[in-house]
């Protein structure tokens, strides 16, 4: 599945806010080495550099289009193409930062444990993941997938990502290797111009695997069906806008 940096950037301010909120809870005054895991177009990497300076900060992602955008944004920063499912730092890092990436990896609990081993003493693993599979925006994806002439493509194997584990699972797995683990949820309510804007948002992330599976032949009809469902489930506010409710989970583990 190929990502689109330009589609992602349409709502960059809203997508960057959780990264900013996550970084604000990282209890490091200084660092020698920080890696932005799943750096995307470099918006979260830029936040790390703004706080700690550029020395020792790098990013990695598995998507060439995202990496190209990141390198244009931060030409003096090293960005590497890598698979987070198997990647491990070659030397201890003070900060491993992951904004909205690990929800795509079903075995991320195992990966978190491995990443803790790649931290320096007192180092931090900081993770944010969307926790929105129960929201109307994502329920409508499944309804559309199984309700149109493209439904045969979804019958044998679905594309819905796995639900996140409960906070207790993250805590139990991480505290064995950490001095402190903080876990919290934040629910963002993003004012969107209309239902079509919600569709544009998810076209850059959660809706992508559905569109890919439906195929180019059905793309426009799939989007029209999905938009109709979104219009029914997101009522207009007094100013004509709609509110996109967006829960996210945050995890900060300090190695000790």
UniProtKB/Swiss-Prot annotation:
One of its GO terms (molecular function) is trans-aconitate 2-methyltransferase activity. GO terms for biological process: methylation. Keywords: Cytoplasm, Methyltransferase, S-adenosyl-L-methionine, Transferase. It is found in: Cytoplasm. Its EC number is 2.1.1.144. Belongs to the methyltransferase superfamily. Tam family. This is Trans-aconitate 2-methyltransferase. It comes from Rhizobium etli (strain ATCC 51251 / DSM 11541 / JCM 21823 / NBRC 15573 / CFN 42). The lineage of its organism: Bacteria, Pseudomonadati, Pseudomonadota, Alphaproteobacteria, Hyphomicrobiales.
């Amino acid at each position: 599945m190929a990502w689109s940096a330009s589609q992602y950037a349409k709502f960059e301010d809203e997508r960057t806010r959780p990264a900013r909120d996550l970084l604000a809870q990282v209890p490091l005054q200084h660092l020698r080495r920080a890696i932005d895991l799943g750096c995307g177009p470099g918006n979260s990497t830029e936040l790390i550099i703004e706080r700690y300076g550029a020395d020792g900060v790098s990013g990695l992602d598995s998507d060439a289009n995202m990496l190209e955008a990141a390198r244009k944004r931060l030409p003096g920063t090293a960005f590497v193409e890598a698979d987070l499912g198997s990647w491990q730092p070659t030397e201890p890092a003070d900060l491993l930062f992951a904004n909205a990436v690990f929800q795509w990896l079903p075995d991320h609990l195992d990966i978190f444990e491995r990443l803790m081993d790649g931290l320096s003493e007192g180092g931090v693993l900081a993770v944010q993941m969307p926790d929105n599979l129960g929201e109307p925006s994502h329920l409508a994806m499944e309804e559309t997938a199984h309700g149109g002439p493209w439904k045969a493509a979804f019958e044998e194997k679905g594309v819905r990502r796995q639900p996140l584990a409960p906070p207790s699972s993250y805590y139990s797995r991480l505290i064995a290797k950490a001095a402190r683990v903080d876990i919290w949820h934040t629910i963002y309510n993003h004012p969107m111009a209309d239902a079509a804007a919600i569709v544009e948002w998810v076209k850059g992330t959660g809706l992508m695997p559905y569109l890919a599976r439906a195929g180019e032949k059905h793309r426009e009809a799939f989007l029209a069906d999905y938009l109709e469902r979104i219009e029914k489930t997101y009522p207009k506010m007094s100013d004509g806008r709609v509110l996109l409710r967006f829960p996210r989970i945050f995890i900060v583990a300090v190695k000790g």
